[in-house]
Curated annotation (Swiss-Prot):
Its EC number is 3.1.4.-, 3.1.3.-. Mn(2+) binds at D12, C57, D324, H325. It is an enzyme of class 3 (hydrolase). It comes from Rhizobium johnstonii (strain DSM 114642 / LMG 32736 / 3841) (Rhizobium leguminosarum bv. viciae). InterPro entries: Alkaline_phosphatase_core_sf, HdlasePehA, Sulfatase_N. Mn(2+) is probably the active metal ion. Other metals such as Zn, Ca and Fe can also act as cofactors. It comes from the Bacteria. Changing Y105A: Kcat reduces 5.9-fold and affinity reduces 9.3-fold with phosphonate monoester as substrate. kcat reduces over 55.9-fold and affinity reduces over 30.4-fold with phosphate diester as substrate. The lineage of its organism: Bacteria, Pseudomonadati, Pseudomonadota, Alphaproteobacteria, Hyphomicrobiales. This is Multifunctional alkaline phosphatase superfamily protein pRL90232. One of its GO terms (cellular component) is cytoplasm. The active site is at C57 (nucleophile). One of its GO terms (molecular function) is sulfuric ester hydrolase activity. Hydrolytic enzyme with a broad substrate specificity acting on phosphate diesters and phosphonate monoesters.
Amino acid sequence: MRKKNVLLIVVDQWRADFVPHVLRADGKIDFLKTPNLDRLCREGVTFRNHVTTCVPCGPARASLLTGLYLMNHRAVQNTVPLDQRHLNLGKALRGVGYDPALIGYTTTVPDPRTTSPNDPRFRVLGDLMDGFHPVGAFEPNMEGYFGWVAQNGFDLPEHRPDIWLPEGEDAVAGATDRPSRIPKEFSDSTFFTERALTYLKGRDGKPFFLHLGYYRPHPPFVASAPYHAMYRPEDMPAPIRAANPDIEAAQHPLMKFYVDSIRRGSFFQGAEGSGATLDEAELRQMRATYCGLITEVDDCLGRVFSYLDETGQWDDTLIIFTSDHGEQLGDHHLLGKIGYNDPSFRIPLVIKDAGENARAGAIESGFTESIDVMPTILDWLGGKIPHACDGLSLLPFLSEGRPQDWRTELHYEYDFRDVYYSEPQSFLGLGMNDCSLCVIQDERYKYVHFAALPPLFFDLRHDPNEFTNLADDPAYAALVRDYAQKALSWRLKHADRTLTHYRSGPEGLSERSH
């Protein structure tokens, strides 16, 4: 029997429209070079309509690794615990005989009922999800990475994140064309790659599952040489945004909060000022740096792919490439992953099956969601997909194409209650449990339903960039009602069903599949 390996690559904050394979297929300007991702696209299937079902990092990774919508796993924001009862991918893989290795992070806060309130994991943004075997952790506080840098003889600054200040500078106003202080040999992308190669060499050809995480192109937006100068700002696509931040802010109260509150310091180490006031030249420079960080990750992936080639494991390995969420990059005068706009939620997904790929090079337009990754991996390994899982296996797409009964809409959610570094709830004067939205989006329309704020409705055919809210337009009233009904039906259909397939009866306990 052929051995089965799984390499799950999870990058951070890489948005879907920065995938050259798709750009070329659409006849768009190829402004980014990713030869190793290109290879994966040529040998696998690229999913062009793929979304994370929630943002930011902690909730997104909870959905990716449990196969559950936000409304079911309820780790609704960074800093919010994940209930221990949920079966995650790591635990499920142990059930099929794998010791799932993890490089990177999952930004998971533990269930407080399972440990002491004094547990140090409650003093950080997140830690590692139970079930995985860490072989190159980035959390908590990036200590493993900083220790590796110091061990290699690099003098760390007193404030360790200042390694991401530009070379020769103690502060930066915003986007910069200067290289990072840290050379590429000691970058975090190199750190993760070295950990991956060490792990794979230690396996010595035995079957493996490896979650290979990368921190980039997540901010701070500064790249090591030569990646800092690899792309010209003038070659970058311009941000898609209204003429000024006030126009964007007028669309919705939640949009106003983010336009008014996003700070440059969250994206450029040591910077001050409003993120919404970056001009086009600064945003193009930021995008050039973002592309440099992407190409650095791609070069690192090339080292991992070469090792799999050299050891004869490439054709034995299912490789999945995806991101936790996207990045606004100045679109709508926003930075980060927030709210309801497409750039925050649309992410890459590429799957290369082991051996021959019947649809090699295909670009699939079916609607897929981050919750589909966990059941796909379990299905490929012959494991049982948990009944509670909201996602669906994508294996049919690799051989035959889109199933006839596949979903016809995309679904994603966002919870904007206060956390220690952002307070939209207080700004909006809402209760904690009123701070949620869900999105139903198909090829034509996008509906955003809020628990306690006005809805949004966009006609994507005529307004693909979501500038005009039609929710209050009488001509669209019937459609708005229809999509509100779709949202309600979706939530009813996907209510927690962990035990709903079991039945008791005269013959004892039975289990139904449908």
